[in-house]
Amino acid sequence: MMFPSLLAPPAVYPNLLRPTPTLTLPQSIQTALSNHTSFLIEDLIRISRPAGFLPRAVPPPSMSPPTSESPNCMSETSDLARREGPNQTSISSNNSSPFLKFGVNAILSSSPRTESAQVLLPSAHPKPFTFPYFEGSFQPFIRSSYFPASSSVVPIPGTFSWPLVARGKPRRGMLRRAVFSDVQRKALEKMFQKQKYISKPDRKKLAGKLGLKDSQVKIWFQNRRMKWRNSKERELLSSGGCREQTLPTKFNPHPDLSDVSKKSSGEGEEEPLCPGNSPAHALPYQCPEHHLRLDTQLPSSPFNSSSASKPSDFSDSEEEGGEQEEEITVS
């Protein structure tokens, strides 16, 4: 080759003549992509975007001036810049004129949006985004103003603050099970034997004396009453009673069943005495012996005598009627 420097980029500006990534594909792959009908976002954006809006690589400005260069390279680069300058301005003017400001192509383009963003936020330098799926048109939405500046990728949805908004009243935490000492347990048991349902002043006084909370004493008495009621129910059911006797009612809001066994034994001893004391109010299921005695004494009562005399009266009347009939027939 006669002039190798015309095709190779100069050493001072290596990125000036470097082609964009979209133009590096072979011709066969480009035709296949253009003929391929796909509904992916990337394909639609690539198809609908004109050539003038393709992103171009802008060379970073070098801070140090060029020190060693030949006059031939400088003249060649200046000639190339002069040739490309009017072409690029004409293409950009032709492409920008038919497209509206709020059109699809203008929205999907990257150069106007990035320029406006740089004008509005000159101090904000967006960090490189690690996902290759988003192009330059989405960069304004993935800036530090929307996401934390410390993270270079999209944060996990759990890190946002909007799911942490209060969804009603906060749930009340469950109380841990209190561990009572032997002294506290004995004092509570002693008070429970005195009164099953402790009043609020006594409960507060007992809690302050034992160094406990009012709620702890209240819960202990509730649990103790439940155990006591279950044991008394078993005793009543075994002795032939019913469960309703242990439950509080309107007439007996605080049932005391501590002497259930004594009461049941006392009732058993008083059963033989019930016929002599109140025979008129005695019920058959309470005094069965008295009921049997009344049945045995029924024949000697005046009601029995009258009832016994009734069949004789009926027989006498029948005989008299028979005699009258005979007399009628004879006459």
From Swiss-Prot:
Residues 315-331 have a biased composition (Acidic residues). Keywords: Developmental protein, DNA-binding, Homeobox, Nucleus. CDD domains: homeodomain. Residues 56-94, 232-331 are annotated as: Disordered. Residues 173-232 bind DNA. It is found in: Nucleus. Signal peptide: none annotated. Pfam families: Homeodomain (PF00046). Residues 299-314 have a biased composition (Low complexity). InterPro entries: H2.0_Homeobox_NeuralPatt, HD, HD_metazoa, Homeobox_CS, Homeodomain-like_sf, HTH_motif. Residues 256-266 have a biased composition (Basic and acidic residues). One of its GO terms (cellular component) is nucleus. The keyword Nucleus applies. May function within the midpoint progenitor population to inhibit neuronal differentiation, possibly through modulating the function of Xash3. Belongs to the H2.0 homeobox family. PANTHER family: DBX (PTHR24331), HOMEOBOX PROTEIN DBX1 (PTHR24331:SF6). This is Homeobox protein DBX1. It comes from Xenopus laevis (African clawed frog).
